Amino acid sequence: MLTYPQIDPVALAIGPLKIHWYGLMYLIGIGGAWLLASRRMKRFDPTWTKERLSDLVFWVACGVILGGRLGYVLFYNLDEYIANPTLIFEVWKGGMSFHGGLLGVMLAVWWFGKRHGKSFFQLMDFIAPLVPIGLGAGRIGNFINSELWGKVSDVPWAMVFPNGGPLPRHPSQLYQFALEGVALFVILWLFTRKPRPTASVSGLFVLCYGIFRFVVEFVRVPDAQLGYLAWGWLTMGQVLCVPMVLAGIALMVWAYRRDAAQPKAA
């Protein structure tokens, strides 16, 4: 059994103002994505400037935060937030949905593309390899918050979490960091080293994330207010990942078939 590192969720307190690690992880993720995007920007479009890139990152970040929070409210805990709507604004306590954040990003990208003459999938293919940076940072934030831990386990790396009871559990946040953050980043980075058909990068991202999240959900404790939705093992996260996997496969097939059907330059 490993010892859980006792980390104060508050990174910095200035009088009554408290800066939480969870929020800092979002800033780190957004900042890291911007730095990587600035390196890849000219390859995406030589006419782009840092100002246009910053504009894109800003709207995508808004989509992540607003979509992620509203997605959690709608998918995971609607009754509680209807009873006490002010809880929606307490984001430092956690409660973000990746699937809601993805929908928020899609809306932001669609709107941005309309303004700047880029197709939806051109922008999504550019953004997709950047997303694992934010996902990985977010999972570290979950770990510091001692939330979203896994089931009771006797594996050598199990941990006793401060608010997870006296028994050691799977550190499922770290599993998700390794898969959604590190592995997904490497897969997409290697895949995009060569030119790919439009929408194929987006398809690979959606497919891999759906698979990784579906697998980790087997050892992660579901949200208490929802529990298991069917057969004693199917969680809300898994329900939301099934259409992602199907959509990812469909997108990749469509992208490559569309590319093959286009006439090639002599």
Curated annotation (Swiss-Prot):
Q: Tell me the route in metabolism or biology where this protein functions.
A: Protein modification; lipoprotein biosynthesis (diacylglyceryl transfer)
Sorted alphabetically, the keyword list is:
Cell inner membrane, Cell membrane, Membrane, Transferase, Transmembrane, Transmembrane helix
Under which main EC class is this enzyme filed?
A: transferase
Q: Which GO annotations describe the biological process of this protein?
A: lipoprotein biosynthetic process
Binding sites annotated in the UniProt record for a 1,2-diacyl-sn-glycero-3-phospho-(1'-sn-glycerol): 139
The way it spans or sits in the membrane comes to:
Multi-pass membrane protein
Q: What are the disulphide bonds in this sequence?
A: none
Disulfide bond as a keyword of this entry, yes or no, is: no
Q: Which GO terms describe its cellular component?
A: plasma membrane
In which compartments does the protein localize? Cell inner membrane
**Is the keyword Cell inner membrane in the record?**
yes
Its family remark reads: Belongs to the Lgt family.
Briefly state the protein's biological role.
Catalyzes the transfer of the diacylglyceryl group from phosphatidylglycerol to the sulfhydryl group of the N-terminal cysteine of a prolipoprotein, the first step in the formation of mature lipoproteins.
What is the protein name given in its UniProt record?
Answer: Phosphatidylglycerol--prolipoprotein diacylglyceryl transferase
Organism source for this protein? Pseudomonas aeruginosa (strain ATCC 15692 / DSM 22644 / CIP 104116 / JCM 14847 / LMG 12228 / 1C / PRS 101 / PAO1)
Encoding gene (name)? lgt
